[in-house]
Amino acid sequence: MQGPSRRHALGAVAGLTGLAAAAKAQSRDGLAGYAINLDTWCKQVPFEQRFALARKLGFKTIEFWTVDRGNGTPASAIRKLMDDNGLAATQFAPAWPNFADPAKIPELLKVTEQAIADARVLGCTKFTITGHALIEGMSREAQLAGYTAGLMRMAPLLEKAQVTGLVEPFNRVNHLNHLLNGSQPALPMVRSVASPRIKLLWDFYHMQLEDGDLIEKFTAGADQVAHVQIGDVPGRHQPGTGEINHANLLKAVRAAGYRDKIGLEFMPLNQDDARAVEDMLALGVA
C-alpha cells in the first residue's frame, strides 16, 4: 500500500503544482490590456535587457520612447529584441523639432518619414507627436497656428502609411514651457485637423495635474483618443499610490469606447517592478 499511496500523493502534489502554475499564468493574463513602458520601468538594467525582464514580469506588449538610443540603434535591433522575447510594440515616441516654427517644417516631414519607416519595422501603427516647446519671441496664437499647420502637413503621409500620430499634451506643473497642456487646446486642435490619422495621446497623469475632472473630460474627447497612458498623482507611480481612482477611471475609459492597450508610463514606486505588477493585477481592470 505504501507504493501506490506514495504515487498517489506525488501525483496530487504534481497536480497542485500544475494548478498553481496555471493560476499564475491566468493571473498574468490580467496584464494583457496593458503596455509596459521600457523607459520608465526596469531601469535597474540597460535598455537592451529590459525586454527580457518585461516578459519575465508577465507583459506581452511594450511601448518606449525613441528608437535611436544615442548610439545609432536601428529599429531592426529593437525588433529583434522584441521577437526574441515574444513582445509586440503598441507605440513609441520619436524626437521632434519644435514645428510650431514654420522654418522647421522640412525637418518635421523628414522625422515623420523616418518614424513611419521605423513603425513598419517594429510592426506597430502608432507613435507619439510632441515638438511643442514654447518658442521665444513668437506669440501663442502664431505657435498654435503653426503647430496645427504642421499636423496638417503630416496628415497625408500618415494616412498613406496607415499609421496614427498621437499628439501628446503635457502639464504646467512639472513640464514647463510647452504650448499644449491638458485637453485644451489640444482636443479642438486635433478636431480641426480632421484626419483619421492625427489623434490624441491621453495621459491621465498630465490630465490630472492640468485639468482634473478626468472621466467627464475623457468621455467628451474619447472620439479623438488613440492611445491612453496612466500614472498616479502625486509621484507618477503605479495606481494605488496616489489620489486617482483608477478602477473607476479605467472602467469609464473602456465604456467610452477605447479598446487598445493602456500604456504604463509611470515609475514603479521604489523601482520595485514586481510590486508594481502585483498592484496592476490587483486593480483588476484593463
Residue positions per predicted region:
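Active-site acidic/histidine proton-transfer and metal-coordination neighborhood
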Residues: 15-19, 26-30, 55, 84-85, ...
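Histidine-acidic metal/acid-base catalytic patches
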Residues: 2-35, 40, 44-55, 123-124, ...
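Metal-dependent catalytic neighborhoods of phosphoester/phosphodiester hydrolases
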Residues: 72-78, 105, 140, 272-274
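Mid-chain, structured segments of secreted extracytoplasmic proteins
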Residues: 76-108
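Glycine-rich, proline-tolerant flexible connector loops at the mouths of alpha/beta enzymes
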Residues: 63-83, 131-134
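Active-site-proximal loop/turn and secondary-structure-junction residues that shape catalytic pockets
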Residues: 40-42, 66-68, 95-98, 133-135, ...
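N-terminal substrate-binding region of glycoside hydrolase catalytic domains
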Residues: 57-72, 93-97
